[in-house]
Structure formats: structure tokens, C-alpha cells
Amino acid sequence: MFHVKHLYAMGRARTMTKKLLMGNEAFAHAALEAGVRVVAGYPGTPSSELIETVAKLHDDGAARGIHVEWSTNEKSALELLAGASYTGARCLFTCKQVGLNVASDALMSLNYVGVKGGMVLFVADDPGPISSQTEQDTRRFASFAKLPVLDPATPDQGFAMMQAAFDLSERYHTPVIVRPTTRINHASTFFDVADATDARPVPDEGFERDPKWVIFPRRAYQAHGEINERLAAIAHDFAV
């Protein structure tokens, strides 16, 4: 059973250093410590610093075994990550709230297909707005897409939720949204973070040919019921 207490009990047996980090920098470290292997997204405030941090750590040799990129757009990024997830790799998607509109076509089908390697969608909302066209609330989008959302109130919560989201995704074979807001993304506080990380290895079997990776109407009919059951199970686990 996945319990909410797991959000605050993530074991990390590495050499650690205390650093003053912006929220987005901390989210990057959290994902790397969780073993993320493929990171892709499209830039836009307040989300951009996450991928910039991952790329810098990779260039410095502190984030080993990963692929990180700015994609052509949000839809391309999510489709790339879907393929990586089907091999068992842990994947992280990043965008700002309006960017999720661009990825929505892939996202709606992806939830019906499901995932293998943990897939986390880091979608930064911008109440205000401070740097966006709209105040779009990703929680409404997630309800429409029938996806679980972890909604941190502080950078510390966000760090823990980012790590836990990968486990939640793999346990229930669903993408999971982590939804910080501008004040969380750009707040700074101290974190104990790993000096170096390694991406989690892809399972030996890698990608396996299976009809479930292709969503046709008959499969979609079955998957819709499975999604409803999955959400009920997640809600129950977080309620006990």
C-alpha cells in the first residue's frame, strides 16, 4: 500500500551536502535522487530552472546516466517520454501550466495506455498571473484527464512529493502530476542533496511488445473502467 507517509520517508544513502536552492533547483535534485533517466520539456516561467539545473549537473558529471533535452514543444517532449517509460525508464516531463494545453492530445491517450517506468509531469502553475497568459489551474486539467496530482504547499513538501511521485506512478501504472506554483518554484531554502546521482537502470527486459501499448476503441473501453478503479484505490490509500 502506498501511504502518504512515504512522502516524508524517502531513504537516501548517499554523500549529502546542505545547499541553499531555489524550489526548481530542489525539484531537479529530488528527481535525480529518485533515479530519473530521461528528462524533457519546454521552457516557460515558472518551470524553466528545473531542466537547466539537470543539464548543468549532467554537464558537471554529477548526474550520471541521464538524457536531458529541451524538446521542440510540450507534445513532442511527452511523446518522447512515453516511449522511454515503456522500456521501464523513469521519466520527467516539465512545462508551465499553459504548456499542458499543447501536450493534451498525447496526455489524454497516455493515461489510457498507462506507463511502465515512473512518469512524473512537473507542471508549474502561475496564480496571479505573474508571467503567463492565464491563471489556468492544472488541478482542473488533471480532473478532466483523470490523473492524480500532488500539490505541494512548500518547497520541502515539493522535494518529498517529487520523489514519491515516481513510486506512485509505478505502483499504479499512471502518469502523476506534481503541481507547484510560482511562489514554490522560486522560493529558496536549504536542502540536503546528494553530491552525485546515477539514473536507475532500465529493467533487463526493456520494451516488451504488447497490444496494451496501442490504444484502440475496444482497449479504451476496458481502460476507462481501470482508470476509475485506479483513482479510487489511490484516493483510498491516501485517506487511511
Regions flagged by a language model, labelled:
Residues 4, 99, 212-213:
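Intrinsically disordered, low-complexity regions
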Residues 1-7:
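N-terminal amphipathic/hydrophobic targeting modules at extreme N-termini
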Residues 13-24, 152, 156-240:
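Flexible, low-complexity linker and terminal segments
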Residues 10-155, 160, 181-184, 198:
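Thiamine diphosphate
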